[in-house]
């Protein structure tokens, strides 16, 4: 329970009135619970989307659902996506890329990445053939994002500074990664049957390609690339689901 509270405090803005000392060893072992942080985020997203959908048109409810995640996370990983785009696409050397990611200012690549991310994300939600599924998508996709993050933790080489937040998860054992994947697959299978499981295969393929690209550019992961990977992972999952629903 302490590990779950730490993970909630780490990945969300939920004000828990509990002070727990950071134990990196137990946090790494307990990282298998990370998808349950996705459950909490997803439940909040679902609630906001559902309430707004009762009063407003579907596009407005979708925007509200997307904004709900920014509220509960503080835009933590959206900022990481912008920083990653600014750094990796800066056409600079490794050291300079890492410096750019640390810069609190958002560059042109970051702005472009965020704009197209949400345009594509919103368009995919509007493309879901069964609108009754949209609420469940808002619930499940944050779980997928945490599953992708766990995949990126596996045998991770850390490229950031030793003081970086992502370094806490350096050396995560293999078994929490496997448990996290099982949780994600159960969630996708429960809500979207075999199509959800097939879609996650596409997410895993994306994660492998993304990981290889990042390692080639900066020699490993850092906090920004980890966060960006989770954000893009849930986008890819939605893309695969919409694609499969159109084909099957």
UniProtKB/Swiss-Prot annotation:
EC number from the UniProt entry:
2.7.8.26
Q: Which GO terms describe its molecular function?
A: adenosylcobinamide-GDP ribazoletransferase activity; cobalamin 5'-phosphate synthase activity
Q: Where in the cell is it found?
A: Cell membrane
Major localisation: membrane
InterPro entries in alphabetical order: CobS
Gene Ontology cellular-component terms for this entry are:
plasma membrane
Query: Which enzyme class, named as a word?
Result: transferase
Membrane topology type: Multi-pass membrane protein
Required co-factor(s) are: Mg(2+)
GO BP, sorted A to Z: cobalamin biosynthetic process
Signal peptide range: none
Q: Which UniProt keywords apply?
A: Cell membrane, Cobalamin biosynthesis, Magnesium, Membrane, Transferase, Transmembrane, Transmembrane helix
- Write out the function statement from the record: Joins adenosylcobinamide-GDP and alpha-ribazole to generate adenosylcobalamin (Ado-cobalamin). Also synthesizes adenosylcobalamin 5'-phosphate from adenosylcobinamide-GDP and alpha-ribazole 5'-phosphate.
Q: What is this protein called?
A: Adenosylcobinamide-GDP ribazoletransferase
Which organism is the protein's source? Listeria monocytogenes serotype 4b (strain F2365)
Q: Which gene encodes it?
A: cobS
